[in-house]
């Protein structure tokens, strides 16, 4: 993604994980074949489901060990745009995240013709860093200014003096407290559906589509304009 070969995790040969689409009233049955050399799990973010299907290892289920298969099975009792991701270690940060879409039933009293039946485009926004997730985690614990320096958002002593906040800067540094920022981590690339850009060439001017957007980022906030 950023010009360097790095370790990542693909599911069904892709990053992000495949979009999963259901309709309210369905029963989801998802087979997870773990071909990694480590344990894994999948968490269904924001879904109403039986606790044992929630996907938190060593809390609601045992970890899915390497070389084994686990089946998640739960009823779809809601509609909306959600996402799913690994809940094991830092696997989410290197590829294990994806879109989870639940469509409204056509006989639902709130079904909107011309909206709920539009062609759907799942979009997952995320980020990529060439640093290993463990190193990112370590640097955050060290409370260094490295990521702020990379983003160009550090405040110099001269700037603190001009703002009348020199004592505040000294005090915060003494407490190893980082300066406030929108996001703590610098990323080399921001991705849309696992790519630097995404073209929807199947549509033409005048077509209507429904974008189902999920933030699959580890620590980024996204502001979209249309």
Map each language-model feature to its residues.
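Histidine-centered copper-binding motifs that mark active-site loops
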Residues: 1-226
């Amino acid at each position: 993604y950023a010009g360097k070969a790095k370790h990542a995790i693909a599911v069904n040969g892709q990053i992000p994980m495949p979009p999963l689409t259901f309709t309210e009233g369905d029963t989801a049955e998802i087979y997870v074949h773990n071909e990694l050399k480590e344990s894994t799990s999948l968490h269904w973010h924001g879904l109403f489901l039986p606790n044992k299907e929630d996907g938190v290892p060593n809390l609601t289920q045992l970890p899915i060990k390497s070389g084994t298969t686990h089946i998640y099975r739960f009823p779809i009792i809601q509609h909306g745009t959600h996402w799913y991701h690994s809940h094991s270690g830092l696997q989410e940060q290197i590829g294990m995240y994806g879109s989870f879409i639940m469509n409204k039933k056509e006989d639902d009293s709130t079904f909107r013709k011309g909206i709920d039946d539009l062609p759907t485009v799942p979009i997952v926004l995320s980020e990529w860093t060439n640093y290993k997730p463990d190193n990112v985690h370590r640097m955050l614990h060290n409370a260094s200014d490295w990521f702020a320096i990379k983003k160009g958002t550090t405040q110099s002593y001269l700037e603190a003096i001009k703002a009348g906040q020199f004592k505040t800067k000294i005090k915060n540094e003494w407490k190893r407290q980082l300066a406030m920022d929108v996001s703590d981590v610098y990323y080399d690339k921001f991705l849309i559906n696992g790519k630097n850009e995404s073209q929807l060439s199947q549509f033409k001017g005048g077509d209507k589509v429904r974008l189902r957007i999920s933030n699959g980022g580890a620590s980024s906030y996204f502001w979209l304009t249309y």
